[in-house]
Amino acid sequence: QTDTTVGFSSSNDEKLSNLDYLQMILQKELEIRARQKQIKLRRASKLPNKVCELSNLNKGLEWQIKQLSHLTWLNEGQNIILLGKSRTGKISLAVHLAETAIDKGHKTYYAPIDTFVSIVENKDINPKAGAAFSYMRECNLIIIDDVFYLAPTRSELQAFYRAVTFLNETRSIIFVTNREISTWLDVVEDKHLCQTLLDRITANCQIIRLTDR
């Protein structure tokens, strides 16, 4: 007969207690591993250290930003164009969306357009560039900053077009730019290729204009 005297636990209680303890240890281990994975993904993403204060963004975007944070667009393979002048919070919002994706286990990668084009052009001859491009191919989300901030050369535009067309087949891309989309054609030599690029990236895309508060 099991001893039920105060100060002693029954054999059933003891077994249950041990099981609870093991479950607690397992849960803690899973939490540690999940956190370590997030840290690893954050480091690999090359995201800038930006803190997104959503309260500092245009008030008219609150509902849209809340919807974006649900990541439905990412699961559906949509692109996003963040458009606005300097200091309107484009990068902060891009980082916020990327970190939200990382929290859900998605691989992401950030690069300014000049870095992105350099990686694409040198991926077959430079091991570091090759590794970066290979990682991009594993990602669910890529962020390209400063799109057409400076006019690309013909060869740069061609490299950009080829890479975006390839990568956009199976993943979402966030394009960050301070240049109105309608003026992209004005800064390139090959306007036909640029128009083809525009048609491609805007076919399944949300365009978000950020303005001063």
What positions do the PLM features span?
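Interdomain "pre-motor" coupling segment immediately N-terminal to P-loop NTPase/helicase cores
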Residues: T2-K46
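Phosphate-binding P-loop
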Residues: S69-G77
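N-terminal pre-Walker A segment at the start of P-loop NTPase domains
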Residues: N49-S69
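Post-Walker A helix-loop "phosphate-sensing" segment adjacent to the P-loop in P-loop NTPases
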Residues: E99-A111
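Walker A/P-loop nucleotide-binding motif
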Residues: G77-L93
